[in-house]
Amino acid sequence: MIRDERVAAILAAGGSGVRAGLRKQWLELGGESVLRRAARALVACDAVDELVVVVPSGEEGRGLAEVEGLGRPARAIAGGAARADSVRNGARAAEGCGIVLVHDAARPFATPGLAARVAEAAARDGAALAALPVTDTVKRAAPRDGAPIVEATLDRRALWLAQTPQGFRRALLLEAFEAAGDRAAEATDECALVEALGAPVTLVPGEPGNFKITGPDDVARARSILEAPVAMGVGYDTHRFAEGRRLVLGGVEFEGDGLLGHSDADVCAHAIGDAILGGAGLGDLGRHFPDTDPRWKGVSSLALLREIAAKVAAAGFRVGNCDVTLAARRPKIAPRAEEMRARLAEALGVTPGQVNVKATTGEGMGFVGRGEGIAAHAVALLVRVR
């Protein structure tokens, strides 16, 4: 990169989002707005010295707030009636910069490396854009009553799909806007204006993941990238033995003294419940079923699991599977493990094949080995459904 010229990144976020039916620049993806994600990639590029965010008139304050703290000087200015007006305003505002990068705020997945390559090509050649070679066969259509017909098959070897960022010497871009006049609004990108001057534009290999959010399907695609389709939680619980209480594990009653607790003290169900709540980011068992609440005194822990399954469903998850290990000298778990699996699965609304129960004796070590109580370790896998 030629470092004797400053580089400004212009983030075009002045659109109304009419095609998508939403204001794309403010849409939240994975905890951040689309605009901030797009800005983050630009300012992470070492070549970029400053950021100019172009937003709808009256929303400059919001636009600036979205890009604060990203490590580059930034300002927000008002856009115009058309994209060309907004980018022209941004280029004019980038005084003192020899190179400008223009990037769609609706492309939140561009990488800093791509921005650097486009900036370098623009500094060297005057104008450049990120683009992908066409891989599908392309047909040119002709109108016909009822449905269009194929007029010709184009040679895809000469066809590229334009992306952003697009980079320019600032003076060249402003000259292109001046020459186009009112016709600038008809151009679908800035490179078309430079091409109209007869100036060469260099193609820089783009990135397949650098797609533009234009409609609901694109929003769903972006969310599928940023929001993990599965989540995992870990649960752990212990209870000491207490005389005169029922011993319930996995919803199944065993012979012998039970465990001390506010509910039925089913340590197996409690560990599973904690794992499921943790995977959904919903805290722990004590938060939802505190031992200070008389509603849960003596209640079956299977009822708690039903409540937990409903809570995680409301949070957009379903239980994929869970695996629990009991550490206990007594009782013998293996003979009744299948019964426990069935009870737990019914409470969670899953099949027994999605629940696994196993046990260890602790080899005589610790409080488990001394026969003072039972411990349970559980892991749960949750599947995001929305």
Swiss-Prot record:
GO molecular function: 2-C-methyl-D-erythritol 2,4-cyclodiphosphate synthase activity; 2-C-methyl-D-erythritol 4-phosphate cytidylyltransferase activity; metal ion binding
Pfam families: IspD (PF01128), YgbB (PF02542)
2-C-methyl-D-erythritol 4-phosphate cytidylyltransferase: region residues: 1-230
Feature type site, description Positions MEP for the nucleophilic attack: 156, 212
Binding site for 4-CDP-2-C-methyl-D-erythritol 2-phosphate: 237-239, 262-263, 284-286, 289-293, 360-363, 367, 370
A single BP term in Gene Ontology: isopentenyl diphosphate biosynthetic process, methylerythritol 4-phosphate pathway
Named cofactor requirement(s): a divalent metal cation
Functional description taken from the UniProt entry: Bifunctional enzyme that catalyzes the formation of 4-diphosphocytidyl-2-C-methyl-D-erythritol from CTP and 2-C-methyl-D-erythritol 4-phosphate (MEP) (IspD), and catalyzes the conversion of 4-diphosphocytidyl-2-C-methyl-D-erythritol 2-phosphate (CDP-ME2P) to 2-C-methyl-D-erythritol 2,4-cyclodiphosphate (ME-CPP) with a corresponding release of cytidine 5-monophosphate (CMP) (IspF).
Binding site for a divalent metal cation: 237, 239, 270
Cross-referenced CDD domains: CDP-ME_synthetase, MECDP_synthase
Pathway stated in the Swiss-Prot or TrEMBL entry: Isoprenoid biosynthesis; isopentenyl diphosphate biosynthesis via DXP pathway; isopentenyl diphosphate from 1-deoxy-D-xylulose 5-phosphate: step 2/6; Isoprenoid biosynthesis; isopentenyl diphosphate biosynthesis via DXP pathway; isopentenyl diphosphate from 1-deoxy-D-xylulose 5-phosphate: step 4/6
Cross-referenced InterPro entries: IspD, IspD/F, IspD/TarI, ISPD_synthase_CS, MECDP_synthase, MECDP_synthase_sf, Nucleotide-diphossugar_trans
UniProt name for this protein: Bifunctional enzyme IspD/IspF
Region (2-C-methyl-D-erythritol 2,4-cyclodiphosphate synthase): 231-386
EC number: 2.7.7.60, 4.6.1.12
Source organism of the structure: Anaeromyxobacter sp. (strain Fw109-5)
HAMAP family referenced in this protein's UniProt entry, alphabetically: IspD, IspDF, IspF
SUPFAM superfamilies: IpsF-like, Nucleotide-diphospho-sugar transferases
